[in-house]
Each structure stands twice: as structure tokens, then as C-alpha cells.
Curated annotation (Swiss-Prot):
One of its GO terms (biological process) is SCF-dependent proteasomal ubiquitin-dependent protein catabolic process. Jasmonate binds at residues 87, 352, 414, 501. Signal peptide: none annotated. Pfam families: F-box_5, Transp_inhibit. This is Coronatine-insensitive protein homolog 2.
């Protein structure tokens, strides 16, 4: 009895012995959402203090809760990030009409959330009416507004945002699909109505931008540090760069002269502001890359994904950029280019090597070959890497072991094995994956997309055993049988989000794995052994667990005829906006 009384007294001391003000201040220094969640579970009082002091929340699936429930849980939110469509939508694997409307959220955000200053919508459908409602309610407060890979709105609503949100410091539109109704008048509105803007990003959109309006924007927004635009001829931006005295990050422009004669090109002594640290240029070729040579030593980020550079060009340019912390390229860089990166870029923290698109209208002037040779060089030469995404043509266990040995700071590693060669040097890669996971103990995100046979059931067992901290995982073409998935699911204690493609596990194995992965909140599968009516998936039914079958669409979505499974936790119950292509398998309990 004495022990129980002591525990009760300790509980009361923990709940009430710390003043709310002090507790709130301490919680303010705890930024990791997992840690905040753990704090909120200590007792009801701490949960209330967490609710009142939480300033930012990310909702990874818009259908996982309701706006009203979120407001009741966190009434003092200042910043909200909201995602809707599955990540597979970025690769055209999800039907266009799947869902993801922002309207219900924007109505509630506009009517409540009285402290909201920053809103980030990702992969959502946002209409002009939605933006009108939001702006009327929050224009006087918004300092950051991001429409990230969104669609459904036009430049007329952007003009409204630019005209009324005069405290806006960040406007982010990258990779969104935007209808042009008023051409680039929204940029002029932004330039004439906003003097505090620090970031403007409409990179990878089809929006037209007048060089004169952009220069006016830079001239009036003296705090502008980040400018990422669509295609705009670089020689028309000379005045802009001479005006942008504190610009640190630029993306866009274009070295494609769109029909101008050769003699009109003059990039000698091209001027970039000395404050420039991060750069991404479009359609730059061998003749133009010399404009970067005088600025290379100052650059911390360089994005060469959308250039016409050869392997040798990459080598020459990277050699002049010893202080790079972020490098993004296509696999045309080759092993030779990665060896130069390893020798030169000792401060590198993030490296992305994307696959070159062979059908991209001439962007591929040389096929790169990134193999275990380049990976081993980077692992040994760049000890501070935290993020590494790479497409390779060949890979060995030794290369993966080298990453585990030398890249222990990695928190995000993604590897895709391309099918350009008939065979790879070594298979399976089980031991290499084991060594990588044992060495990279800080990993939070892990993707391993290979070929059938490249990772056996034994390798899947290693992933389960050594993925203690991984929260997101993508696996493609892995395993030999259901047993491999079941072995994986006995581990991975922190795994919240799992994506599987081309693995062909049975519905029964998928259901059992979901039940064994205790932290799992989200599952997406394409390519599995489907039954005629999905009855074996019923085994994964549990309270608050939504299950959707996305039917194959021979014309648009899944030309290989593979259905998809999407399952996720939801406190909101079964959603009501299913299109015909989506079949709710079982309602939430």
C-alpha cells in the first residue's frame, strides 16, 4: 500500500509540481513531434499544457483527422503542414480524381485557428474559391504560405494573395499546376504591395514571368533572399541580379535562347550577386557553365539536374566548388564525377543523383554510369553526409558495407537500382544491407528499390532486425516469399509509413505484417498477389484503420494492370469523397 501511495504522490508532483509557465517554456524547446507526443502522455495536465503550447503540427494524411478535432486538440497553433494525396501521386500512380480537396480544411482554418501564421499545403487540390475564403480571413496574419505540388487554382487568386497578404514573408508554389488567367500581374501586385517578402518560389511551374516585374520585385522587396522562378532567358535577368544585393538562393532562368541567334549570346562577365550561396540553373550547357567558375568557391548548394552538362563538365565544375553542402545531379555525372565530388566536397551533407530521362528532349547527351565505384568513393570521401539518394546501374555488398562504415551520420538513404544492364555484379545484397543498417544508426528514412532477386527473405529479416529508428521505408522488388515480409514485420519498432512496390506478397501476409508493425500508421502497396474480392485483407481490420483498394486503370494510372492498397489510421472515420476508381474495403471501426 505504501508503494502505491508513493506512486500517487509522485504522479501528483509530476502533474502539478511544475508551474504551467515553466512547463510551457521547457516544452517550447522540444521540437521533435515524437518527443512532444511522449510528453503529452505523461498525464492529463501535461497533455493540456502541450496542447496550449504546441506551435506547429504536421498532418501527414489529411483524411486521418478532421479540422475541428485538430483545433480542439491544438487551439493555439501558429503553423500547420497538411498533406493529402499519397506520395505515389508524384509518379502518376494515383488517379487524378482520388481526392485531396483542401476545401473542408480551409473553411475550418478560416473560421478558427486564430493564431495561424504559416500554412503549408502539399499534394492538395486548392480552388480559387478556397484561396478567396482563406485570404479574407487570414490575410492580416499570414507570414508564410506554401502551395507545394498543388493544383486547381489560378493566377487570379495569386494576385489576390499578393494584393492582400502584406505581411507575407514566404510564398512557395514550386511544382504546382497553376492556370494562367492574368498572366504575371500577380508578380506586379506582389512587388507593389509587399515590402517584407524574403522568399518567392514558383520553380518548376509553367508560369510566365516578366523580367521587368521580377526586377521591380527585387527592387521593392529589399529583404528578398530566395528567388526561384520558371523559365526566363538569363540575359534578360542581368538587371535583376545587379539589383538583388542580398540574394542567397536562386533557381530557374534559362540558357535556352528560344530562337535568338548565336551572336546575341554574351555571357562573358555575367554578374551574380556576391551574396549568392545556392544555385539551380535551367538548360545550361558546356559553353555557359563558365559563368559559374568565379562564384564556385562561395556556393553551398548546386543543382545541375536540369542542365546539358556532360560527365567531364561535371568534373570541371565540381572541382571549383569545394564548399558545397548540397549537390543535386543526374547520373550523367558517372563514377568519375562522383570521385571528383569525394575528393573536393568534404563538407557535403546532402547528395541526390537522379536518373536521367532518356526521352527528355536532348537533356541526355551522355549516359552516366553510377556504380559501386562511385558510391564507395563518396562514402569514404564525404564523411558528413546526412541525406543520400542515388540511382545506380550496378551495386555490390562491399559498396553498401562501405556506406555503413563511413557514412554513420546518414539519417535518410535511398537507393534505386536501374535496369540498364542485363545483370548486376553481385546478388543478393543481403549482407550489404545488414552492414549498412548496422552502421547507420541514425537512419530515419530508408528506400531500397532494386530488382527481383537482389534482396532475399534473409535480407528482409535483416531490415526488420536492424531498423530500430527507421520511421519511413520504401521497398521495391524485394523478397522471395511471404516469409520475408513476416520476418521484417517482427522488427522495425519505429516504422510509421511503409510503401511496397512490385514485391508480390500475398494479401494474408500483408495483413499479418500490418498487425505486427505496432507503430505503423500508413501503408501503400502496388504489385501484390491479389485475391478476387480482397477477403484476406480483412485480417488487417482494426479500429480507426481505413483500407482502400485503388483499381487499376489501363489507360492512365497503372498500365501494368496492378491494383493498389492504401491503408491508414484515421480518427475521422471513412471518408465520403471516394471516386469510382477507389473502393473502400472496410469502414473504420
Amino acid at each position: 500500500m505504501g508503494g502505491e501511495a508513493g506512486e500517487r504522490r509522485l504522479g501528483r508532483a509530476m502533474s502539478f509540481g511544475i508551474p504551467d509557465v515553466a512547463l510551457g517554456l521547457v516544452m517550447g524547446f522540444v521540437e521533435d513531434p515524437w518527443d512532444r507526443d511522449a510528453i503529452s502522455l505523461v498525464c492529463r495536465h501535461w497533455c493540456r499544457v502541450d496542447a496550449l503550447s504546441r506551435k506547429h503540427v504536421t498532418v501527414a494524411m489529411a483524411y486521418s483527422t478532421t479540422p475541428d478535432r485538430l483545433f480542439r486538440r491544438f487551439p493555439c497553433l501558429e503553423s500547420l503542414k497538411l498533406k493529402a494525396k499519397p506520395r505515389a501521386a508524384m509518379f502518376n500512380l494515383i488517379p487524378e480524381d482520388w481526392g485531396g480537396s483542401a476545401s473542408p480544411w480551409i473553411r475550418q482554418l478560416s473560421a478558427s485557428f486564430h493564431f495561424l501564421k504559416a500554412l503549408h499545403l502539399r499534394r492538395m487540390i486548392v480552388s480559387d474559391d478556397d484561396l478567396d475564403v482563406l485570404v479574407r480571413a487570414k490575410a492580416h496574419m499570414l507570414s508564410s504560405f506554401k502551395l507545394d505540388r498543388c493544383s486547381g487554382f489560378s493566377t487570379s487568386s495569386l494576385a489576390l494573395v499578393a494584393r492582400t497578404c502584406k505581411k507575407l514573408e514566404t510564398l512557395f508554389l514550386e511544382d504546382s499546376i497553376i492556370a494562367e488567367k492574368e498572366n504575371d500581374e500577380w508578380i506586379r501586385e506582389l512587388a507593389t504591395n509587399n515590402s517584407v517578402l524574403e522568399t518567392l518560389n514558383f520553380f518548376l511551374t509553367d508560369l510566365r514571368a516578366s523580367p521587368a516585374y521580377l526586377t521591380l520585385l527585387v527592387r521593392n522587396c529589399r529583404r528578398l533572399k530566395v528567388l526561384k522562378i520558371s523559365e526566363c532567358f538569363m540575359l534578360d535577368l542581368v538587371d535583376l541580379f545587379r539589383t538583388a544585393e542580398i540574394l542567397q538562393d536562386f533557381a530557374g532562368g534559362s540558357f535556352d535562347d528560344q530562337g535568338q541567334v548565336e551572336e546575341s549570346r554574351n555571357y562573358e562577365n555575367y554578374y551574380f550577386p556576391p551574396s549568392l550561396l545556392r544555385l539551380s540553373l535551367l538548360y545550361m550547357g558546356t559553353k555557359e557553365m563558365q559563368v559559374l567558375f568565379p562564384y564556385g568557391a562561395a556556393l553551398k548548394k548546386l543543382d545541375l539536374q536540369f542542365t546539358f552538362l556532360s560527365t567531364e563538365d561535371h568534373c570541371q565544375l565540381v572541382q571549383r566548388c569545394p564548399n558545397l553542402e548540397i549537390l543535386e545531379v543526374r547520373d550523367v555525372i558517372g563514377d568519375r564525377g562522383l570521385e571528383v565530388v569525394a575528393q573536393t566536397c568534404k563538407k557535403l551533407q546532402r547528395l541526390r543523383v537522379e536518373r536521367g530521362d532518356d526521352d527528355q528532349g536532348g537533356l541526355e547527351d551522355e549516359h552516366g554510369m553510377v556504380t559501386q565505384v562511385g558510391l564507395m568513393a563518396v562514402a569514404q570521401g564525404c564523411p558528413h553526409l546526412e541525406y543520400w539518394a542515388v540511382h545506380v546501374t550496378d551495386i555490390t555488398n562491399a559498396a553498401l558495407e562501405a556506406i555503413g562504415t563511413y557514412s554513420s551520420s546518414l539519417n535518410d538513404f535511398r537507393l534505386v537500382l536501374l535496369d540498364r544492364e542485363a545483370n548486376i555484379t553481385e546478388s543478393p545484397l543481403d549482407n550489404g544491407v545488414r552492414a549498412l543498417l548496422r552502421g547507420c544508426t541514425k537512419l530515419r528514412r530508408f528506400a531500397f528499390y532494386v530488382r527481383p532477386g537482389a534482396l532475399s527473405d534473409v535480407g528482409l529479416g535483416y531490415i526488420g532486425e536492424f531498423s530500430k529508428t527507421i520511421r519511413y521505408m520504401l521497398l521495391g522488388n524485394v523478397g522471395e516469399s511471404d516469409q520475408g515480409l513476416l520476418q521484417l514485420s517482427t522488427g522495425c519498432p519505429s516504422l510509421q509509413k511503409l510503401e511496397l512496390r512490385g514485391c508480390f506478397f500475398s494479401e494474408r501476409a500483408l495483413a499479418v505484417a500490418v498487425l505486427q508493425l505496432k507503430s505503423l500508421r500508413y501503408l501503400w502497396v502496388q504489385g501484390y498477389k491479389a485475391s478476387p474480392n480482397g477477403t484476406d485483407l480483412m485480417a488487417m481490420v482494426r479500429p480507426f484503420w481505413n483500407i482502400e483498394i485503388i483499381a487499376p486503370n489501363q489507360d492512365e494510372v497503372c498500365p501494368d494492370g496492378q491494383a493498389q492498397i492504401l491503408a491508414y489510421y484515421s480518427l475521422a472515420g471513412m471518408r465520403s469523397d471516394y471516386p469510382h476508381s477507389v473502393i473502400p474495403l472496410y469502414p473504420s471501426v
